[in-house]
Each structure stands twice: as C-alpha cells, then as structure tokens.
C-alpha cells in the first residue's frame, strides 16, 4: 500500500522519488521472493501520468484503480464509451492489472483524471456522496479529491441489479 511514498529525500516531493522508489520496492520484492510471495503494489496516480505502465514495465502487477469509477460512470450514465476505451487500452498496453471494484479504500477518484474530465469526476463524487460516501482529499492538499469512502454496493445506490452488472463487467 502506498509504496510510492516510502523513500524520503530532503528537498524532493514525497511521491515517486526515482530511483529510490524502485530501489525500495526491489528490496521488498527480494524479501518476498525468498518466501514465495508475490508483491501487488498499490499506487494512486492520475491515469494520464502513466504510472501504472511504469509499474508494469518494472515487472509488477498492480491494482486497477480505474475500473471502480469507470463502471459506476458507465452504469449511471447508461454509456459505456469511456469504459470501453479504457478496456481497449488495457488490451493494447497489457499493464498487468488486478481488478477490484470494492476495497478498503472505497472508490478511487484521483486515478480517473485523464479518463474522465474534472466535471465528470466531480459529478461522480457528488453522486456517491449523495448515497452516503465520504470524500477523502489527498494528504496535504485541500479540495484535491483522492477517493470516496463507501462500499461499492452503496456507491451503486444499493441496487442489486447494478451490483450484479458491475461484477459481471469485472469478470
């Protein structure tokens, strides 16, 4: 979780300080490998930054933090265009992601930047908040959306049909 914040260097930002971030992750991977474990790094960064692709090029799988919001967007707007565009990119780029619509972090929002417009993300946030979600802003920043904490079922309006559709899309 949040491996990109691990290495700290005075004067640098606290996120993805290269090469220190990769060196730290590699040391952890070596320890994991010695015990037969596989690492699954989690990183929240806007889609447009391409960080998930860097993680894949380094040989790691990573969480697909784009799927949860894109599925809600597609279901609620009755339009799968953006979801399909993203799915095509996944097929082409093969970034080795693991799908997980529901998790302990709620619904990632920061990651959607570059897939949805700011206005679309703000609408999605408002919808999920109206269903009981709570906004969590990026650490150290004000009014910079990070995620909306709630269950995926709640984010879908506690609608069993929408939840079944979301899980079918996940598969």
Residue ranges of model-derived segments:
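Active-site and adjacent substrate-binding regions of carbohydrate-active enzymes
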Residues: 1-171
């Amino acid at each position: 979780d949040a491996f990109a914040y691990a290495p700290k260097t005075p004067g640098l930002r606290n996120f993805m300080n290269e090469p220190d971030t990769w060196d730290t992750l590699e040391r952890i991977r070596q320890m994991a490998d010695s015990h037969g474990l596989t690492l699954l790094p989690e990183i929240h960064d806007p889609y447009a930054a391409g960080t998930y692709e860097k993680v894949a090029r380094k040989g790691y799988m990573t969480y697909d933090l784009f799927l949860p919001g894109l599925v809600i967007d597609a279901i609620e707007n009755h339009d799968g265009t953006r979801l399909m565009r993203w799915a095509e990119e996944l097929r082409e780029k093969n970034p080795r992601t693991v799908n997980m619509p529901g998790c302990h972090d709620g619904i990632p929002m920061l990651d959607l930047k570059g897939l949805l417009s700011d206005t679309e993300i703000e609408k999605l946030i408002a919808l999920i908040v109206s269903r009981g979600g709570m906004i969590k802003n990026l650490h150290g920043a004000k009014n910079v959306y990070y995620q909306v904490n709630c269950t995926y079922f709640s984010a879908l309006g506690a609608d069993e049909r929408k939840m079944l559709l979301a899980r079918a899309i996940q598969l």
